[in-house]
């Protein structure tokens, strides 16, 4: 092997993960319930960014567990609860959402993350909007 190839390989293995940019990012969630009069716009932080992954050419030869990709996910988080205004008494007017404190590149945990990217997802209000700053 040539010295250039070896140096490139060592550099890539050593500093490859530093190219990942995964950090808490400000995000607005729009929440509404059919029974409630208002839509609530909640400012929070989510984990967003890019994580280095490696795609194998021999997918048929590997176990499914070896094919999982790293995603930008929560390292530390807590749940905040907001009150949706204008709800009738028989409705539960609370909505809980995650707030990212720190993030990491790792396997997606379906216990607290949506691991599937949906192509069509709306994030807007259809009712009069109230702002919630927590």
UniProtKB/Swiss-Prot annotation:
Disulfide bonds: 22-72, 36-87, 39-125, 47-103, 51-105, 108-115
One of the GO biological process terms: G protein-coupled receptor signaling pathway
Keyword Hydrolase: no
Major site of localization recorded for this protein: secreted
A GO term from the CC aspect: extracellular space
UniProt keyword annotation of ATP-binding present: no
Pfam family for this entry, one: Cys_knot
Gene Ontology molecular-function annotations: hormone activity
Signal peptide positions (record): 1-16
UniProt keyword list: Disulfide bond, Glycoprotein, Hormone, Secreted, Signal
Purpose: Indispensable for the control of thyroid structure and metabolism.
Identification of the protein by name: Thyrotropin subunit beta
Lineage summary: Eukaryota, Metazoa, Chordata, Craniata, Vertebrata
């Amino acid at each position: 092997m040539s010295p250039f190839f070896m140096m490139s390989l060592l550099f890539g293995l050593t500093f490859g993960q530093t190219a990942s940019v995964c950090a808490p990012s400000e995000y607005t969630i729009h929440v509404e319930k059919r029974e409630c009069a208002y839509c609530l716009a909640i400012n929070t932080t989510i984990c967003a960014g890019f994580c280095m992954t490696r795609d194998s050419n021999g997918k048929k030869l590997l176990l499914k567990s070896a094919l999982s990709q790293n995603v930008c996910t929560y390292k530390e988080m807590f749940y905040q609860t907001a009150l949706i205004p204008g709800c009738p008494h028989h409705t539960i007017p609370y909505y809980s959402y995650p707030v990212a404190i720190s993030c990491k590149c790792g396997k997606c945990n379906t216990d607290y993350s949506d691991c599937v990217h949906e192509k069509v997802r709306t994030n807007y209000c259809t009712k009069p909007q109230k702002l919630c700053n927590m």
